Amino acid sequence: MTTSVDNTFFDFDAKVAGPVLKVPLPDVPVFDAPALTELALPLTEATVGLLVTCGAYYPDQPRMGYHNDLSYRKLPRERDLSEVLFAHRTPIRAFALADPNVAYPRDTMLDLERDGVIGRYADFAFSIVGSISNYDDLATRTAPRIVDEAKAADIDLLLVVPFCPQCHVAGGVLARAIERRGLPTTSLTTLYKTAGSVKPPRATFLDFPLGCPGGRPDRPEQQRAIVRAALETGVSAAVGADWSLPRLPFTWNPDGNRDWENLVADLYRVDNEIRGTVLANMSQHTDQLAGQENEFTIRCAC
């Protein structure tokens, strides 16, 4: 898979945080590159699992909390997406409500298994609400539980799919902690600056709207191509190589039009004027990592 060299990306601070929310986002921690765990099998033979941060769950499962909920749900591979619900309250959930595969790409993974791109899609996916700033417990409590359950299910590689801006930080921290505990990960990100700061292992960047790491709604061929590219590009990262953030060669609009940036801003604007969900959620995130990254990585092994 050839990656793009275009340097354009969606700047959440400039497009949303300042003009719409009227508040600066918390400083994003800047980590050193993570150490990688060797992937034991080629992708075509590996069992690949998902870790999504959109808070996907099913009606017979307990709903997750809106913020700092360190629990997760296991989503069986055979459960139809017509039943899935989303506990994450971010305005960009509108995309996932239109097509769950953009945030929880279960159908995409089953298609990649059928096509022989991956050896097998795991029996279940892990799902959290990624609006988390309790980073110590996320790394030392949640990550070990996920690793234990993933290894018991013979998962060889975990694809981490962050959703909102806070998900990109929490998901990156979680991916680093999981990798450090011996389970290879790769992350499919849509916030370039945040991913470049947190440095999740084997990350790739897709210049698509927040909330759509798995592709455009109702475009299954594109969704398969994106997730395949993310997996194949991610696993090509060599242990010991310099960390990088390859840009996947896909555009939201065929002509390259970036009107989707205004759509994302409008989703936040409507929420801010009617519900105030984002600002209320931001007020709950008092734990910050910026300035104490080295101490955190030593303390929490990530």
Predicted regions and their residues:
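Metallocofactor- and cofactor-centric catalytic cores in central/energy metabolism, strongly enriched
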Residues: T2-R181, T185-V235, D242-C302
